[in-house]
Amino acid sequence: MKKIPRIGVGGPVGSGKTAIIEAVVPILIKLGYRILVITNDIVTTEDAKHVQRTLKGVLIEDRIVGVETGGCPHTAVREDPSMNLAAVEEMEAKFPDTDLVLLESGGDNLTLTFSPALIDFFIYVIDVAAGDKIPRKNGPGISQSDILVINKTDLAPYVGASLQVMDDDSRMMRGKKPFVFTNCKTNEGIDDLVHLIRENVLFDTEVSKESA
């Protein structure tokens, strides 16, 4: 069976992890990729149901599954990812034609990381509403994720946050690692995020042609 790349999508509660997934999946599907989505919640499968409703007619429900972790979000994706590994392996066996798995963690804090046994690539999502100080607070999600997503840019004027400060601090904390500003209501930055996924995870040769 082919090795299917897996992206872990993590971040604090309410940062927009589910919205990011719901924004990128239709674009990836339109480009011809076959996707699986696995979400984590502590005592429900609400995120999975939300994705199923939002992507109805775009991604069949059977390709979206929720995992009830019953405990700390980071435990289920880092210290003991066995439930998620079982879910991923079951879904990959059911849909062997899959090109990409998107695995959303439960909402956690800036220390969230994923077990390398579970994912190949890490996207960390923060939101502007939490304040422009978040990037300089650092943490593994800020500095070590493969892509940092700074979501909800439209809220900056309402919370007194400076996008320029967040940009400067993200560059300082991440060095050359990519980050992208997004607004899921307008799709601002979503094409850029999809481009990074195609280039760095799916190794799509068409991306370099498009950039030329």
Curated annotation (Swiss-Prot):
The lineage of its organism: Bacteria, Pseudomonadati, Pseudomonadota, Alphaproteobacteria, Hyphomicrobiales. GTP binds at residues 11-18. The keyword Chaperone applies. HAMAP family: UreG. The gene is ureG2. Keywords: Chaperone, Cytoplasm, GTP-binding, Nickel insertion, Nucleotide-binding. GO terms for biological process: urea catabolic process. Gene3D superfamilies: P-loop containing nucleotide triphosphate hydrolases. Belongs to the SIMIBI class G3E GTPase family. UreG subfamily. This is Urease accessory protein UreG 2. Facilitates the functional incorporation of the urease nickel metallocenter. This process requires GTP hydrolysis, probably effectuated by UreG. It comes from the Bacteria. Homodimer. UreD, UreF and UreG form a complex that acts as a GTP-hydrolysis-dependent molecular chaperone, activating the urease apoprotein by helping to assemble the nickel containing metallocenter of UreC. The UreE protein probably delivers the nickel. It holds the Pfam family cobW. The keyword GTP-binding applies. One of its GO terms (cellular component) is cytoplasm. It is found in: Cytoplasm. GO terms for molecular function: GTP binding; GTPase activity; nickel cation binding.
